[in-house]
Amino acid sequence: MSTSHALPRDYAVSTSSQSQLVMAIPEPAEYGDVPPPDSEPAVIGENEARRILRHIDWRLMPLLFVTYMFNFMDKTILSSAAVFGLREDNNLKGSDYSWVSSVFYFGYFFWNYPTTLLIARLPVGKYVACNTFFWGAVVGLTAACSSFGGLITIRFLLGVAEATISPALMFITSTWYTRDEIPTRTGIWFAGNSVGGIVASLLAYGIGHIDDRLHPWRWMFIVLGVSTFLLGFVLLLLIPDRISNARFLTPNQRRWAADRVVIAGTGSTENTTWKWDQTRECLQDPKTWLIWSVALLCQIPNGGTQNFANLVIKSFGFNSLQSTLINIPYSLICVAAISGTGWIAGRFRSMNCILIVLIVIPPVVGSALIQCRRQIPHGVSLFGYFLLSTGPASLPLIMSLVQSNFRGVTKKMTMTALLFVAYCGGNIAGPHLFKSSEEPSYETAFRAIMICYALVVVLVLSLTLYLQVVNKRRQHEEGITGNAGSSGLVGDRVGVDVADARNVTKAVNEVHLRSEDYEDVTDLKSLGFRYRF
């Protein structure tokens, strides 16, 4: 068990190397309902703490899960629509379908950075709800498309609409949860992605039987569009904008929830302003670009397989209806991979990068099997396709690295924006690796997938080594052990043992937080802050 080190309130670092880690404390901000500076800590018993955390989980996790489920369904139903007449009804030729797939990410890229600014500045619950109304309307209007131009336009707008969802959910998660809880909670709501794949497959299978003058693919977008629009009302009523106005908690519970993320999270996200010095720090931080590169290389395979999945399955000899059902076991494997790796990453602070390496190995094998499809039975090729299903689990692990290792609202949101620039770039490039001239084998695409994931392994190992070196250097320079479960120096103690939830509750009850502990400070300037890897 690590030992807590008492430090005076006016503690200052004297050496030149340490002085770079300390920033001047600005004037205290206004904190609204949470929490009065320099006051007594919120005292909550261990059983009560577990009950409050469950209450928070049951309020937030279902909402985030369902939102992300619709986020995935509305985006990827295109793959099912493609085998139910969308290409023919919109007269798509040659690479037109690839452009329809990838233009979504141009819209996403266009709105990515502006929306991260708005998430940090606006009431996040209301902003997400209003965005969902627009998003649902765009999905429903896709059914009215009858040309390549119309489809391109509506898909671009869908990218704009959905650009808010992932960054907002990441922001909400880091607002409410500790560094040890973030990977597991991210895994829970991100699993909605794969459950959405199952629901979308069943929906496509059911709607595919409709014999109507309105073709099945149009009904898919109508049903999903209306459902998404209605979801907006639920989010408007139930998602709190911040901890201090969460009406489902009492004032003392809100204080406890706010204190725990200051002690064991990545700091308070309330009453902050956009700080351009944090943007510069993010851009100059080596771990920013290592994580960015890993995200880009993981998303290139995702962009292609996500949009060409049903076409690849159909090439194995299955019809349109069968190809939609075959995606169900694929999605189930994906759910297991996302949930399992999220739980492990939350339980063990040095497993995140190792898990990324482990989950990208099966897709390499799967791509090799599909590439050799002419020499092997269709059943083996289908098995190779199922091996691709662990690849999407890399993104929530990368998100967790960002949420847990970046402190400072502006720095974290800048990194979030960069993360989704990589997400867009990979998903724009991915579909164009599936060349229509190589249909149905797509040799270039599956060769590229193998190369991308091989490079991911190299970069992730480099990131692990870098973060280990930085942790050791900071420990030597600061003279403080620190740990990867706390937010660093808070109150009159540092190195608070937060090995599990009981330690967090004990720390919240005992540590007298000061007004400066709620200030918006980056990870590089937080004494005792150590990185997870």
Question: Could you describe each region identified by the protein language model?
Answer:
Residues 1-70, 94, 236-268, 443-533:
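Intracellular terminal tails of multi-pass secondary transporters
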Residues 79, 277-342, 399, 431:
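Extracytoplasmic gate region of multi-pass secondary transporters
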Residues 79-110:
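Extracellular/periplasmic helix-loop-helix junction of adjacent transmembrane segments
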Residues 90-91, 114, 122-123, 144-150, ...:
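Helix-breaking motifs and short loop linkers at transmembrane-helix boundaries and internal kinks
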Residues 110-149:
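Conserved MFS/SLC helix-loop-helix module at the cytosolic interface between two early adjacent transmembrane helices
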Residues 110-123, 337-351:
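Helix-to-loop junctions at the C-terminal end of transmembrane segments
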Residues 126-140, 353-368:
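Structural signature of the two symmetry-related core transmembrane helices
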Residues 183-213, 227-228, 416-430:
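Glycine-rich segments within core transmembrane alpha-helices of 12-TM secondary carriers
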